[in-house]
Amino acid sequence: MPLGLGRRKKAPPLVENEEAEPGRGGLGVGEPGPLGGGGSGGPQMGLPPPPPALRPRLVFHTQLAHGSPTGRIEGFTNVKELYGKIAEAFRLPTAEVMFCTLNTHKVDMDKLLGGQIGLEDFIFAHVKGQRKEVEVFKSEDALGLTITDNGAGYAFIKRIKEGSVIDHIHLISVGDMIEAINGQSLLGCRHYEVARLLKELPRGRTFTLKLTEPRKAFDMISQRSAGGRPGSGPQLGTGRGTLRLRSRGPATVEDLPSAFEEKAIEKVDDLLESYMGIRDTELAATMVELGKDKRNPDELAEALDERLGDFAFPDEFVFDVWGAIGDAKVGRY
């Protein structure tokens, strides 16, 4: 487990205060005091003005997953900015940051940082390690891969199905970033684009994957894991709020998802894996948010087309999403 450097008498608070911008609100500066100048009802000549109003500032603790001192980051509104802040804190090129996990230094895809961060979550950044090229013979239509991405241009393996084509190739592991297929660069591609390319590869042919694995500490070099189910392992984050990172628009501090929303997001994420070979809790959360107040599947389809038209979801998938949201609403899990 990575350790922080040095001894600390008291950990700094996660929420600090900073000065508000000048000119916000009336501070009474320059207003005349009581006649005679001796009263205490207004500001006096020669004294500094009252302190400006304070506003909360969100500060998160972070480490490099393979081991580093503890850094503190703030002032980001999306995943790309988050990676930039992490790189700045540890003096790394931003492109070295592959993905982040919450409250564990392990390559645990159930703890992957997506679109939400608990206000007391500890962020572990996984950076690029060994590069490798692997030849794969596509003996079946399905390779057994589930793809996700980091929201900043890197697609990587989130899950490997047991007994699948890829499962028999032990050089390929969960967490490996897919840089290229047959020499075609995939940097900047979304997960669904990579999944589609893999699906379209002809059966009975050999193809080449160029991969980069996360850098490992000595205690992390062990047999690979195909990924567990959500909710496994200790829940270390205790913040009651969550910072919602959006690809468009500012980040917002929100309450934790309700039980209905959590279950609906999980079911929609399962549908994304089943239909498209990807997992993306942020995308699933957006779909639940769009669908929870819709009255029928047609309204949901219209909302998805307007907000997420690039995905071109098939009608049967939209219908299943509508059903999953409806089941979660009535507690039919």
UniProtKB/Swiss-Prot annotation:
Coiled coil: none annotated. Keywords: Congenital muscular dystrophy, Cytoplasm, Dystroglycanopathy, Membrane, Phosphoprotein. It comes from the Eukaryota. It is found in: Cytoplasm; Membrane. Widely expressed. Expressed in skeletal muscle (at protein level). One of its GO terms (biological process) is positive regulation of cytokinesis. GO terms for cellular component: cell cortex; cytoplasm; cytoplasmic vesicle; cytosol; dendritic shaft; dendritic spine; extracellular exosome; glutamatergic synapse. It holds the Pfam family PDZ. Residues 23-44, 228-240 have a biased composition (Gly residues). Residues 1-11 have a biased composition (Basic residues). Interacts with GLUT1 (C-terminus), ACTN1, KIF1B, MYO6, PLEKHG5, SDC4/syndecan-4 and SEMA4C/semaphorin-4C. Interacts with RGS19 C-terminus. Interacts with HTLV-I Tax through the PDZ domain. May be involved in G protein-linked signaling. Belongs to the GIPC family. This is PDZ domain-containing protein GIPC1. It comes from Homo sapiens. The lineage of its organism: Eukaryota, Metazoa, Chordata, Craniata, Vertebrata. The gene is GIPC1.
